[in-house]
Amino acid sequence: MAVKEPVGIIGAGLIGLATARQLAQSGVPVVVWEKEAAVARHQSGHNSGVVHAGIYYQPGSAKAKNCRRGVELLRAYCAARGLPWDERGKLVVARDEIETQRLREIERRSQANGVPGVRWLDGPDIRALEPDVAGVSALLSPTTAIADFPAIARAYAADVTAAGGQIRMNSPVTAVRRHGDGVQVVTRGGTHTVSHLVICAGLQTDLLARAAGDEVAPEIVPFRGEYLRLRPEVRHKVHHLIYPVPDPAYPFLGVHLTPRIDGEADLGPNAVLALAREGYRWRDVSPRQLSRLARSTAFRRLAGQNWRAGLREMHGSVSRRAFLAEARTYLPWLEAGHVAAAPAGVRAQAVDPDGSLVDDFRIHRIGPVTAVRNAPSPAATASMAIAEQIVTELSPSNLRA
């Protein structure tokens, strides 16, 4: 017999749990289905740990608005829950005149987005702040922080259950179908009918959204982000987060140096096509995923437009020397012996039919279904703000007990 639940959520990552938390604390019965044995097992637990201040994003975009709102909510939440938060600050370093011009645009965006304390640095200012960093100019974002996102996800989950919500682990969703004015969700535990379904499934979102009646686009193409970890003897050389000026043609921030909340420091990530939806290693290969890519017009167009960049990223993946060469342009002291391999992550990158990478957050609403179709960085920072948006857009009739 079908079980009636008012609101269902697929995915126990940061956005799914933040949404469940807000619903449960508002008195709305909610159930979260998660295919893994623990929360935050994929993107939410495999990111760089950076709490972004909002300097990069197009003013007025969903990223800009949700990042600024999200960082304030998250800072207060971590303080209230006693979760670690380290406001290290970030330097975005320009290495030549072209990058300096791009950096001026980032400065303009940071001002338009209301990011506090951002200031311009010339070469001597950089060296005074970070003697081991090379650059001709930089932006300092003093409120950029690092945090423990897996711990934040666990805290969200504890809030959900404390408020009466349910989180069902080891519960992969095998089918989603519209049913009258609601949705049926099929798991190993049975068939569950919900008044509203929120899909926050990251790397699997496009497949589940289509099953629930959403359009094909955008498609998810998985990109693996690989990291190298600084050895203990050189971690002290840099205090701030150090980022290059991003190439505006790509929604990636480039290989950067990030101190982590546990005292480690990582260099990365690159952006390499993953051969499986959860392809954390080169040997993780899914014939089904490769078949999907081969049939995808969007992917073929993406590959055709960006094959040179793709080859460069693949070269950096198989050659540590090539990986380090990019970082040496602003960390000239870096040597191969200073780093070791670190765990990789996989980014769920949405791609439109014309082959363009979707940059902004994208959330679709299809009747009783909300599908988070694109939530790259800074989605972890913005998780509580995105949850606010999702819950606000649900009608009262969807939230009946």
Residue spans for each PLM region:
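Glycine-rich FAD pyrophosphate-binding loop
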Residues: A24-H46
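C-terminal catalytic lobe of FAD-dependent flavoproteins
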Residues: T297, L302-A401
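Helical element adjacent to the flavin cofactor pocket in flavoenzyme catalytic cores
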Residues: L139-H196, L207, M384-E393
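Short beta-strand to alpha-helix junction loop
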Residues: P59-R69, V93-R102, L140-D159, R168, ...
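Conserved Rossmann-like nucleotide-cofactor binding loop
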Residues: I15, A38, Q204
